[in-house]
Amino acid sequence: MARIAGVDLPRDKRAEIGLTYIYGIGPTRAKEILAKTGVSPDTRIKDLNDSEVAALRQVVENDYQVEGDLRRLEAMSIKRLMDIGTVRGRRHRAGLPVRGQRTRTNARTRRGARKTVAGKKKATR
């Protein structure tokens, strides 16, 4: 099993798809990496030899921010926005949509489950 950037790549997938299991590598970046290393995108992960895996590992680790480093970088960027008090930072802190979406309705994913508030009681006769 090929292990790149701390991720076990699925053996039966094509190299092009298998690389996308690494956080920070999507389909386009996977194609770039395979082109740089000269590995065919149609090769299965289990069919890669040790030198190809080593080449892939070297390109991923040296040229791209992936996995923990990328997550840390994103968290630090959001924290910076919150610290300097930008509108985006305040929206992050409040748990609201950051990019101008409406919040009167929808925005359920970002705001979380509904908190029911007791309504006005009906007058009994």
Swiss-Prot record:
Organism annotation: Synechococcus elongatus (strain ATCC 33912 / PCC 7942 / FACHB-805) (Anacystis nidulans R2)
Top-rank taxon: Bacteria
UniProt record, GO biological process: translation
Protein name as it appears in the record: Small ribosomal subunit protein uS13
Family statement drawn from the similarity comment of this UniProt entry: Belongs to the universal ribosomal protein uS13 family.
Matching PROSITE patterns: RIBOSOMAL_S13_1, RIBOSOMAL_S13_2
Keywords per UniProt: Ribonucleoprotein, Ribosomal protein, RNA-binding, rRNA-binding, tRNA-binding
InterPro entries associated with the record: Rbsml_uS13_C (IPR027437), Ribosomal_uS13 (IPR001892), Ribosomal_uS13-like_H2TH (IPR010979), Ribosomal_uS13_bac-type (IPR019980), Ribosomal_uS13_CS (IPR018269)
Assembly and interaction partners: Part of the 30S ribosomal subunit. Forms a loose heterodimer with protein S19. Forms two bridges to the 50S subunit in the 70S ribosome.
One Pfam family linked to the record: Ribosomal_S13
Region (Disordered): 93-125
Function: Located at the top of the head of the 30S subunit, it contacts several helices of the 16S rRNA. In the 70S ribosome it contacts the 23S rRNA (bridge B1a) and protein L5 of the 50S subunit (bridge B1b), connecting the 2 subunits; these bridges are implicated in subunit movement. Contacts the tRNAs in the A and P-sites.
NCBIfam families: uS13_bact (TIGR03631)
GO CC field: cytosol; small ribosomal subunit
Gene3D superfamilies found in the cross-reference section: 1.10.8.50, 30s ribosomal protein s13, domain 2
Bilayer-spanning residue ranges: none
Gene: rpsM
MF annotations from Gene Ontology: rRNA binding; structural constituent of ribosome; tRNA binding
Compositional bias (Basic residues): 101-125
